[in-house]
Every structure is written in structure tokens, then in C-alpha cells.
Amino acid sequence: MSNLLPFIGSFLFLASGIFYSSGGEKTNTSPFRYVPAGHHEKLWDSAKINPSQVFRIDKSISIYLENKQKYVNIEKMRVGGVPSAIVFTLHGRESTWHFGKHLHEGSRLTGRTRYVPKGRPKASPKNGHTYTFEESAEDALYKLKDMESVNWSRCNDALYNIEKYNWLGYLRYHRDVNSPYLWSGTQHYRKGKYVADGRFSSTAIDKQLGTCALLLRMQSRGIKVGFR
């Protein structure tokens, strides 16, 4: 086992199809071959929000409306940037809309990320002591990952890349469970989740709102989500 450590330390493969060096930097991408054609779009077209979640979703959407310019600014950091509504949903999943936490994985902006991806951003905070939410978001979306290259106007591409932002373990290892990262709060998700990195429970229930539950409601209220 000790002979394998240098190799393991050099490269970690995530199910997202992106290789990361031990420093957490992108090295190259490879196609992911576990997704049926149109998989995400078909789920979107048939998705219904659980009635019990509508009030909670609307309350969450008020956070977007109150802070919309912050999310728009992140979208505008790059040509073809991540739509502001999608940035908002990722922010909810990763750090419960806390502007003092990293968009990568929810640790505090007072230091680099503590979990996967660990040690981001690589650059020191511009003010010398604490990262801003904008610095963190730019690193998470556009430096660590190149999400500006996604065609966000296409539903299937958009939803696939939202799931990929989390990871594609459900598609690869648990095809009977739709990722709660997207579908929690809709009829497409009931139970089963990763309770820790690489540890899946078939009985655990994800109680966070899924990104698609939020986006469906936003779209129904006339808020642009980036596709359709």
C-alpha cells in the first residue's frame, strides 16, 4: 500500500470526469459515458415540485431577489458565464446562501477550502486576510472548473453540469437514485444519498432543496434561469 501512496497523492480521479493534481488544479478532462441521451432534460420535463416544499422554496427565492446583483456580477465575470439563477442554486447547496463561505464546499472565507477541493483558491486573499464571496465564486466556477465553456442555454447541458459540479457518483454507481443535489424537493427524489465522501446510504434522506426544485419554481414565476 505504501508504494501506491505517491501515485494516489499525485492524482485523484473524481467521478465528474475531471482529473485533479494533489494541489487541486485541473489537469485535463475526459468524457463521461454513463449518461443516457437527454437524461436530464427528460427528468426536467416531467418534474413536479412537492406541494409541501413550495412555501420553503419561495422563501429561499426571496434570497435571490434580494441579492440578485451579487449573482449577476458572478455571471458577468466571464463571457458565457454561469447564469445568475444557477449560481444562486449552487450557493444554496454548498453553503446555504451564506456569503461568508466558499462556493466550492462551504468552508469559511477566512481561509482556503478545507474539504474537497481542498486548498482553494491558490492565490492569497486580495485584501490580505479574508476571501470575498466573489473571489471564491470566480475560483470555483471559472478557475478550478471552466464552467463558462458550458452551453447554458441547453437544458440538458445545464443540468448535467450542475450535477457534475457536485459529482456524478449517482449516475455512475447508483442509477436507481436521482441526485438530490438536483431533484430533492421534487417527485424525482425520495431517499438515498452520500452521507460522506464516497459513503452512500440507501435510507438517508437529503433535506436540502435541490437545484432543480428551485429553478422550476423560479421559471414558473417568470425568473430567467438561463435555459428555456
Predicted feature locations:
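Short, surface-exposed glycine/acidic/tryptophan-bearing loops
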Residues: G100-K118
